[in-house]
Amino acid sequence: MKRALHIGPLVFRDPVLLCGVLYVLLWFDASGFLRLGLCAAFLHEWGHILVYWAMFRTFPTIEVTLTGFCMRTRGRSMTPQQTFWLAAAGPLTNVLMAALWAVRLEQEATIRGSAFWAANLLTGAFNLLPIPPLDGAQMALALREALRQRNQGLQFLRKSGKIKRMKKR
């Protein structure tokens, strides 16, 4: 039986196991690279949250599990364009952070700085894979739906006589 702890819009799935595993992993993370990866993942999700807030002026429900964070948008009606930009916000945040960090690395290159840069690039690139439930799959589905709606609109306009099919030369 899975337990959940609700704190405002945050939902922690199986919080005792989550905290225990996180504690052990951070205990053995002498290099600090896990912390940098977690920071990149947090920034990624924060990008989604900011765009969601900008669209709807409310915060989404955020589920925290052993596999990471995820935003629940069930019950929220969104256009394909909104869905696309909401999904793209996380990877764009990671790319923006990597670009800012690259400028910083030109001035003073450090191992941790390079690791943070790489963590952001890898987090953004991984989430662009078109595999559900990753952002790339959400973006592809939203793009497909937008094209389908556009084609339906064009077909309606052709049938109603508002526009005519162009002849090939």
For the regions a protein language model found, what residue spans apply to each?
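Hydrophobic transmembrane alpha-helices and their immediate loop junctions
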Residues: M1-R169
